[in-house]
């Protein structure tokens, strides 16, 4: 299931820096805009997976999963 997030990006000197608006701590810095977007995408996917593993580990062994829509 694909989700959409908002990347906030800006150029600062010779660097591009960016953040994922909806997820604290997901930020990157790269030399080009294309590299930045790719790096944000990878970092976001890793952050979501790590958070998922942490949540499941904390809730184990007995838990249920529910979808929540905002």
Each predicted region: which residue ranges?
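Short, charged, surface-exposed hinge/linker loops at domain edges
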Residues: 1-6, 34-70
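Short aromatic-glycine-(Arg/Gly/Cys) micro-motifs in beta-strand/loop hairpins
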Residues: 9-21
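Intrinsically disordered, low-complexity regulatory regions of eukaryotic regulatory proteins
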Residues: 19, 28, 63-64
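ATP/adenylate-binding site constellation spanning eukaryotic-like Ser/Thr protein kinases
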Residues: 20-23, 41
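A short, exposed loop/beta-hairpin motif centered on an aromatic-Gly-Thr core
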Residues: 24-35
């Amino acid at each position: 299931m694909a989700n959409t997030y908002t990347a906030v990006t800006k150029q600062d000197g010779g660097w591009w820096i960016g953040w994922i608006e909806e997820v604290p701590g997901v930020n990157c810095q790269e030399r080009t805009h294309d590299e930045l977007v790719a790096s944000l995408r990878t970092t976001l996917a890793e952050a979501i997976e790590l958070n998922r593993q942490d949540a499941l580990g904390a809730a184990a062994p007995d838990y249920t999963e529910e979808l929540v829509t905002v």
